[in-house]
Amino acid sequence: MNETKKRSIAILGSTGSIGTQTLQVVEEHPDKFEVYAITANTRVDELIQQARKFMPEAVVIADESKYKQLKEALADLPIKVYGGYESICQIVESKPIDIVVTAMVGFSGLRPTINAIKAGKAIALANKETMVVAGELINELAMKHRTPILPVDSEHSAIFQCLAGEMNNKVEKLILTASGGPFRTFTKEQLEHVTVQQALKHPNWSMGAKLTIDSASMMNKGFEVMEAKWLFGVGAEDIEVVVHPQSVIHSMVQFGDGAIKAQLGTPDMRLPIMYALTYPTRLSSSFERIDWNTLKELTFEKPNLELFPNLQHAYTAIAQGGNIPCVVNAANEICVAAFLEERIKFTDMPKLIARAMEKATYILKPTLDDYLETDREIRAMVKEWI
């Protein structure tokens, strides 16, 4: 990092969990970062507060019905105000931006990420759906435009850190750790009666609603396997998921000689966020440290694929390839929304996803338009079933 010049950041999804924690990192090091642009989907009040506090050059609200309110609230400040999803796709191309934090939830993060890569911006990747849906396309674009993609997910950040300095050494496998979520010890019968409130209580991490449900169903871990495949160029057969309830080891890499490197830390998303923003430098932080005196044990177990079929769906989707990962993502987004609205049971989600995988029109080499069409088609189909 150039020590004199501040790194200019755009945060897509600044009012969400990752977005707000990114702003906390900026507050921790105001001499290192400046916020060029922040965007939100619908949370206009939080966006107004953030704009007043961080004074970005530009602010975008995707929900156009909130544009007038945003514009009026910031009228006394020299901030450019935009409305609509297209504006988010365009703002990432702004010349002063050095790094784009893709903290939007779901498929909507894909197009802005593609535009940012084409504009040569470094990507701090928090929107895992981008790699799940279109990992191959993203990798090709990143290579073509020589754009670094820096993982923000704690697991992928851990692997990224473990691989540092190992460029010429054989990687035998990546080991992704999973907390197991709040229902790790449940029976099939208990899972049938899970409530939204129960599912939203994650034992270790603080996250948004969508991600918390994905963690409870282990779909999140499935997505992380897909993401790891594209980020690190390994086959799914070389990615192992291990349940580690304490969430102290964030992930591991096993090398050809049998040695294993692990990255440990407190379950605090600000750590991987900061590393992505400052790579290859490490800044000091005031964040909590591990207390080795109170840490009693680190335990590990196999994931239960019978209880959590979503993880198996992810491996199946990788094996089938083409647009099937996109199918899984679209079906899952509709299922999670329906579960949060209490229209389906927790155990209905993996069943609907499996059905979508069966019914989808298979495309071996999808283009961006194919991904968009698959996404539309599957969402409509699953909505109809619900």
List the model feature ranges, each with a label.
Residues 1-386:
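Catalytic, metal-anchored helix/loop core of enzyme active sites in primary metabolism
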